[in-house]
Amino acid sequence: MELRVGNKYRLGRKIGSGSFGDIYLGANIATGEEVAIKLECVKTKHPQLHIESKFYKMMQGGVGIPSIKWCGAEGDYNVMVMELLGPSLEDLFNFCSRKFSLKTVLLLADQMISRIEYIHSKNFIHRDVKPDNFLMGLGKKGNLVYIIDFGLAKKYRDARTHQHIPYRENKNLTGTARYASINTHLGIEQSRRDDLESLGYVLMYFNLGSLPWQGLKAATKRQKYERISEKKMSTPIEVLCKGYPSEFSTYLNFCRSLRFDDKPDYSYLRQLFRNLFHRQGFSYDYVFDWNMLKFGAARNPEDMDRERREHEREERMGQLRGSATRALPPGPPAGATGNRLRNVAEPMASTPTSRIQQSGNTSPRAISRVDRERKVSMRLHRGAPANVSSSDLTGRQEVSRISASQTSVPFDHLGK
């Protein structure tokens, strides 16, 4: 049965979950262009998709920010249609047997720092920096890192005066415990420093394959978060980064040294890793581990140089667009969402089949697990035709980008 959104997009199969709501594959009925469609039941207790769409709109024009194509309500669902992206870094990490080379980690670090800096320049903090929330582009943008999921983003300063939000303690905060900063565990209001500290843990996760505070057992979630907090605070940075270049420990020490309202020196952090990159003799050819694993043959040097120039040009153009973009209406004030439980996907009251305009009489065909894994693997080919025909949308099944064990969840102040 064909499902339509806004009488313009055809709804396909579920491909993932965000902080609030589920994400489906879709296609423009007129052009066949594939898109991602995020749905949220209008009857959900704490509607969030409209707020998230405002965040995305405020971020438009930045490099590595997905474009928003349509927002509105359809039946009993709030809907956001956005640019379709490739696999997440968590997907790719698993594809590469849960270990990235130093070159790949440094290539990613450079772009990820820039994405976080851009969000901060727009007066927001992300508050859920993790591998699942960074996706690679498709086709010609296959080497570009995107940042997604602004369901937990928060305004940290006034757009006009740049007045910073006040320091607070005893906060009930949200995020993913594995990558949360130490101050977040302590219940301190999050600021720019916390996004960057979380990124430091993500980079070491890519280096190590896992973090020392993973896999801890506890009777309750609260006790588990307490154990994670204790392990994280008792693990010296030098121990965490042992066996890896000192730049990683320097990065984390720098992040932890920042005061609450300090503006991080993003250029210093980028240059830290760039200098290491050059000392290692690496080339900015944007060949990541998943490219080599899937296609081991070396590429033409002219192609690699062209891609490097295109990437640098896109970065420059994005910065110009971002600075020239007219200010949009500000999002909700800091703390406007209150202390409700905020980072668990709300269950849908019913399936989209019963709520969104229906037409046609095609039923989805069953797809085996092997076929699903093959399709996910096919997405990893940089520059390959990652899209499928619109007619196959009802038959395409993707593996959720966010596993249950890594979904962001709220956690209470651990000092209580």
UniProtKB/Swiss-Prot annotation:
Listed EC numbers: 2.7.11.1
Disulfide-bonded cysteines: none
Catalytic activity entry: L-seryl-[protein] + ATP = O-phospho-L-seryl-[protein] + ADP + H(+); L-threonyl-[protein] + ATP = O-phospho-L-threonyl-[protein] + ADP + H(+)
Residue ranges with Polar residues bias: 350-365, 400-409
Skewed-composition ranges (Basic and acidic residues): 301-318
Top-level class of the enzyme under EC nomenclature: transferase
Summary of subunit composition and partner proteins: Monomer. Component of the circadian core oscillator, which includes the CRY proteins, CLOCK, or NPAS2, BMAL1 or BMAL2, CSNK1E, and the PER proteins.
Name assigned to this protein: Casein kinase I isoform epsilon
Organism: Gallus gallus
